[in-house]
A protein has these predicted regions:
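Dinucleotide-binding Rossmann-like beta1-alpha1 core, especially the glycine-rich loop
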Residues: 46-126, 135, 244
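Flavin-dependent oxidoreductases
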Residues: 15, 175-244
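Glycine-rich FAD pyrophosphate-binding loop
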Residues: 21-43
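Conserved Rossmann-like nucleotide-cofactor binding loop
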Residues: 12, 35, 203
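Redox-cofactor binding/interface segments in oxidoreductases and associated redox assembly factors
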Residues: 7, 50, 198-199
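Helical element adjacent to the flavin cofactor pocket in flavoenzyme catalytic cores
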Residues: 138-195
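N-terminal Rossmann-like FAD-binding beta1-loop-alpha1 element of flavoenzymes
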Residues: 2-29
Length: 244
């Protein structure tokens, strides 16, 4: 019986694999695609959130802040691209200033460091191409972006070097409890493990409902569009910019 099976080789699965590789354990990662970072992790904005918008007291709030603090050291250790560009939440109307203040107070309560509300002149100095309608912004210097591919590959490579096994082109079909652990049935056979980590991205609810049908959950996925610009446009926007 395997000690741990991780389902999904995206950034969450590969990061979990790397962390668990610190211990004496037999760890297997199952991935339905042909390589790591082929699902949700390959198609996202790669933002390291500062943690100002997560509801205070939630696990997301705590992990946003903790993850943001840990990211620079991880990037140096594993040699993946990390840009501490900071983030701005831009306010376009005077009547929305109280919302900006609430966001600042929520972030401060969450422990986000360096938060400030800046006015038009400072905002224009930081982002010369920002809309003339912008009147203020919440500045979060701990916000950043990473390369999602490089980060995921770095986690996976480090995990593999420390004994974690990866099996690709293996789609999980069933997960259910057995004596002393769990059975994971796939299109390439069955695997038993003492523990299972569900890191299946937008399909994590499907696996959860297999394992715990009495406590069903549903992930409501969202899809966005990306515009690929020429590299000469790289300085047009200097920070991660959100609209309030």
């Amino acid at each position: 019986m395997t000690d741990v099976i991780i389902i999904g080789a995206g950034v969450s699965g590969c990061a979990s694999a790397r962390e668990l590789a610190r211990y004496k354990a037999d760890i297997l990662v199952l991935e339905k695609e042909e390589d790591v970072c082929c699902g949700t992790s390959k198609a996202n904005s790669a933002i390291v959130h500062a943690g100002f918008d997560a509801a205070h007291g939630t696990l997301m709030a705590r992990l946003n802040v903790e993850g943001s603090k840990r990211m620079p050291a991880l990037a140096r250790e594993l040699d993946f691209a990390y840009d501490p560009c900071g983030s701005l939440v831009v306010c376009l109307q005077e009547e929305d200033l109280p919302k900006l203040q609430q966001l600042y107070e929520n972030g401060t309560a969450n422990g986000v460091e360096g938060l400030r509300i800046i006015r038009r002149d400072e905002l224009k100095a930081m982002e010369p191409n920002i809309s003339d309608d912008a009147i203020a912004a919440l500045w979060a210097p701990t916000g950043a972006i990473v390369c999602p591919f490089g980060m995921t590959y770095a986690f996976a490579e480090n995990a593999a070097k420390n004994g974690v096994r990866f099996q690709f082109d293996t789609a999980v079909q069933k997960v259910y409890p057995i004596q002393g652990g769990w059975r994971v049935e796939t299109d390439r056979g069955s695997y038993d493990a003492r523990l299972v980590v569900n890191a299946a991205g937008v399909y994590a609810d499907v696996l959860h409902n297999m394992a715990a049908p009495a406590q069903p959950m549903q992930i409501i996925a969202r899809r966005g569009d990306y515009f690929l610009l020429d590299h000469t446009a790289g300085d047009h926007v200097r920070h991660t910019v959100f609209q309030l």
